[in-house]
Amino acid sequence: PKAGYPNSKVEVRTYDIKSHVTRTMKLPLDADGYIPRIRFTKDANKLAIMTLNRHQDRFDLYFADPRSTLCKLMLRDESPYYIKENIFDNIQFYPEYFSMLSERDGYSHLYWYSMGGNLIKKVTNGKFEVKDFLGYDEEDGYFYYTSNEESPLRKAVYKIDKKGKKTKLSQ
C-alpha cells in the first residue's frame, strides 16, 4: 500500500459451478497478511493456500476444503530474514505427498512431505543451493533439480532418489 494508507484486506473465495454458491474460506490470516499463491492439489477437496505475514519472514501452507470452507495449517516455514519468492513456484503436489524448497538450514534444499504435513525426508543436503525443483518421476522414484553444487557461478541438472543416490545429468 501507499505510505500512510491501510493494507488491503484479502480473503479466499470459491465458487461451486453446479450450485452457483460462493463460499469464503475460513483462513486464519493475519490482518495485514498476504496470499501470494493458491494452487490446486491432486485432491479435489484440498486447495493449497500459501500465506505470508507482513514482514514476509513466515510462510504458512494451508489445505482448504472448498465445500466446508475449513482450512488446516499443514506447514509453517520461518526465516530470520525473509522467505524467498521461489518457494511458491517450487511446491509440487502429488496424490500422497508434496515437495518444496526451503532455506531453513541456511541453504535452499528440497524437502518431501506427506499430505498431512509431516516431513518424510530432506531430499538434498550440503553447502549448495537448489535453484529449481524440476519435478518428481513417480515411476523411477527420482527428484530432478538444478543446483550450484560444483560452483556458485554455474548450475547443473541433477537427479536424486529417495535414498540419496545422486546423478549429474548436465555438463
Where are the predicted features?
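Beta-propeller folds
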Residues: 1-171
